[in-house]
Amino acid sequence: MKNKQPIAPPNAPSNAASKAPPNVPPNAPPNAPLNAAPIALPLARYSAWRRAGDLVFLSGVIAVDPATATIVKGYADIPGDARRLLGETGEFSTDILEGPILAQSWYVLDRIRSTVQAAGGRMDDVFKLVQYFRNLDHFPYYSRVRKLFFSGEPPASTVVEVSAMLPTAEILIEVEATAYIPLSR
């Protein structure tokens, strides 16, 4: 799952925002919603995101690549530029402890960014996040990553600890997002 393409800083504009998402992605399941850009394909039978007027609602995003069903387990599963931004040390004891939650946090927020851009918005349009953690001790690590994606005023936020997440215990975080993206853009 290593991505060799260079990544832009989290708040940089993307070319994806200027292109309308295809009506039906080539790898979409037969019952995929028409608004499912390839980055936002759901992992089960639900909409990854829905628009209601100027509001865009994202279902919970986890650190699983829907195209390959690969779980992000640590630094090795994200691009090198992201690893450097997150502070990969190269020290086994530190990276094995912090790497999984930092990598999953980055992946989830990057997928949210890509989905919001596919809907015609940017991260500054996200005004509400609901973050689910298997262990609240992970919140400070996630918070560090979230600051990379929201450099200005952060969205309203709810944090919840849960006993388990689907599809496996390797999933450490899930994030729902709501954005205000005017149709007139």
What is the predicted role of each segment?
Residues 2-10, 29-185:
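Short, polar/acidic, helix-capping and beta-turn segments at strand->helix junctions
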Residues 1-2, 24:
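Short, low-complexity, intrinsically disordered N-terminal peptides in bacterial proteins
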